[in-house]
Swiss-Prot record:
Belongs to the cytochrome P450 family. This is Polybrominated aromatic compounds synthase. GO terms for biological process: hormone biosynthetic process; progesterone metabolic process. Its cofactor is heme. It comes from the Bacteria. The keyword DNA damage does not apply. GO terms for molecular function: heme binding; iron ion binding; steroid 17-alpha-monooxygenase activity. Its EC number is 1.14.19.-. It is an enzyme of class 1 (oxidoreductase). The keyword Iron applies. Heme binds at residue 437. Cytochrome P450 protein involved in the biosynthesis of polybrominated aromatic organic compounds. In the presence of ferredoxin, ferredoxin reductase and NADH, catalyzes the coupling of bromophenols and bromopyrroles, forming various polybrominated biphenyls and hydroxylated polybrominated diphenyl ethers (OH-BDE). Can also mediate the heterocoupling of 3,5-dibromocatechol, forming six different compounds, including polybrominated dibenzo-p-dioxins, which are among the most toxic molecules known to man.
Length: 495
């Protein structure tokens, strides 16, 4: 172990009167450094290193030195208390190339502020008074999922990925372009494409940070994942760009058919001199925004549902409690409504605990960097230093969670059995600070609606004698390594 030392003469530091502590550093060339840069389970490796080096440590790479934040206090200090300091994009090539450089999370400064405000306004105006319509559209897709699963019989073992992914993509296509997927879209849709993005981002970043003499061997091992990341991200960008071009042909300012129209109108309303000043174009405001709706909404929504069905199947006693509540509040042969959510306390606790326990967002897709010299918990951080924010570490923070490795939905319940908002406030599946996910409300709507309907309609189980497997494919989002389940209809008419 050695320590990261910098010139600590920082006049505006919150701890300027105290001598800076030296950051424990994982030195380039050490075995620990090799593990950090090569291990497939990056989220586990970075968390395990915190047990040895502490909640805050530095990682030397072939390109720069990064600071890893691994518990709630460290992350909150940087992203909440010093959000004005850690508000720039790290100087990494992967963050500065198209199409991802046009994504809101990967922008900084005035461009980020303008893009966020414009995107937020467009989403707010689009969803206002449309939640009931959104619910109906999503239930239409869920009905198709139900029909597909019933048709294969209750003894069929299957991965629900394609059915969930394609129907969620169809719903989002309707939100963005006012039409569901047709036969052509379904025929060319690759449900695995979004699954490559989280791991691809991590491995592409590590490849860039590798010393030159290690890059060839690293690419030989991870090159397939890196190439799929680039090709699938470009494919997603092309899909959105093609559809936006179609919609622009019949676009009339002031008329609103879908989310794309709201973004087109919002982009038109930005004065040209402001766009030029901050470097904002349609590529950011429209294409970048919609690509994130399709990618994050479709990807994370599908990842979350696969996790939740896997947890239902893996913990049958917990599933019985979910079913008992759904039957009591809704009725076994009735249809869930958005108005039921406030009475589904155990169901909400189950959802919250799955998102915590699987740690679906293991780290932000953006790499923050310090815009000036500063301190975190007494450790000096030089201007331009990139951060690794370990969200997975926060889900295993024993200062926040008792027995964090155990799956306990009841931890999100108060003593009277109601859902605990206090506990929910300690969990950050959509990020923390001013850069937390802009689509959090929409994401929660998707996850809650899909889960409530599917849990209400089916009983899920593992194949006979199949052990519980909650292993994840590591990336900025954690994707289930394997989901093989059975689905038995709970409808009384099917009994």
């Amino acid at each position: 172990m050695r320590y990261y030392e910098e010139d600590a003469n920082v006049t505006d530091s919150p701890n300027r009167n105290a001598a800076p502590k030296l950051i424990p550093t994982i030195k380039l060339g050490s075995q620990d450094n090799h593990d950090m840069m090569w291990n497939e389970d990056f989220h586990l490796t970075i968390t395990n290193m915190a047990k040895k080096y502490g909640a805050i440590y530095a990682l030397e790479t072939g390109k720069t030195t990064l600071i890893a934040l691994n518990d709630h206090n460290a992350v909150r200090e940087a992203l909440v208390n010093q959000s004005d300091v850690f508000n720039i994009r790290a100087d990494l090539e992967i963050l500065q190339v198209a199409p991802q450089k046009h994504f809101l999370e990967l922008e900084a400064g005035e461009l980020w502020s303008l893009h966020r405000k414009t995107f937020a306004t467009a989403m707010r105006d689009y969803f206002r008074d449309r939640w009931d319509t959104m619910d109906q559209w999503l239930v239409t897709e869920i009905d198709d999922i139900e029909a597909a699963w019933k048709s294969q019989g209750d003894q069929a073992v299957f991965d629900p990925n394609r059915d969930i992914s394609i129907k969620l993509a169809s719903f989002l296509h309707r939100v963005m372009f006012d039409r569901r997927f047709g036969e052509f879209e379904e025929s060319v849709f690759d449900e695995k494409s979004l699954s490559w993005l989280p791991a691809g981002f991590i491995n592409s970043t590590r490849y860039e940070l590798m010393p030159e003499h290690n890059k060839e061997s690293y690419y030989a091992h991870y090159g397939d994942v890196i190439e799929k990341f680039a090709s699938n991200l470009n494919g997603l960008d092309a899909y959105v760009s093609m559809n936006v071009l179609k919609e622009k042909e019949c676009y009339n300012k002031g008329q609103y058919r879908h989310l794309t129209d709201f973004l087109l109108n919002a982009c038109d309303d930005i004065p040209n001199d402001v766009k030029q000043q901050v470097g904002a174009t349609e590529k950011e405001i429209i294409i970048g925004s919609l690509t994130q709706v399709a990618g994050a909404g479709g990807g994370v929504g599908a990842f979350a549902l696969r996790w939740m069905l896997l947890y239902l199947a893996s913990f049958p006693e917990k599933q019985k409690q979910v079913h008992a509540e759904l039957d009591q509040v809704i009725g076994q042969n009735e249809t869930p409504q958005q108005s039921h959510k406030g009475d589904l306390h155990y169901t909400q606790a189950f959802i919250a605990e799955v998102l915590r326990h699987c740690s679906i967002t293991s780290m932000p897709a953006s790499n923050y960097a310090a815009s000036k010299d500063t301190f975190i918990d007494g450790y000096f951080v030089a201007k331009g230093t990139p951060l690794i924010v370990n969200n997975y570490g926060m889900t295993r923070d024993e200062a926040l969670w008792e027995n964090p490795d155990e799956f306990i939905p009841e931890r999100f319940l108060e003593a009277d059995g109601t859902f605990s908002k206090k506990q929910q406030a300690k969990s950050f599946p959509f990020g923390i600070g001013q850069r937390r996910c802009l689509g959090e409300l929409f994401g929660k709507f998707l996850i809650n609606t899909l889960f409530t309907h599917l849990a209400h309609r089916f009983e899920f189980s593992l194949p006979n004698n199949e052990p519980i497997n909650l292993r994840a494919i590591s990336g900025v989002f954690l994707v289930p390594e394997k989901v093989d389940i059975k689905a038995k209809s709970r409808s009384l008419s099917d009994s």
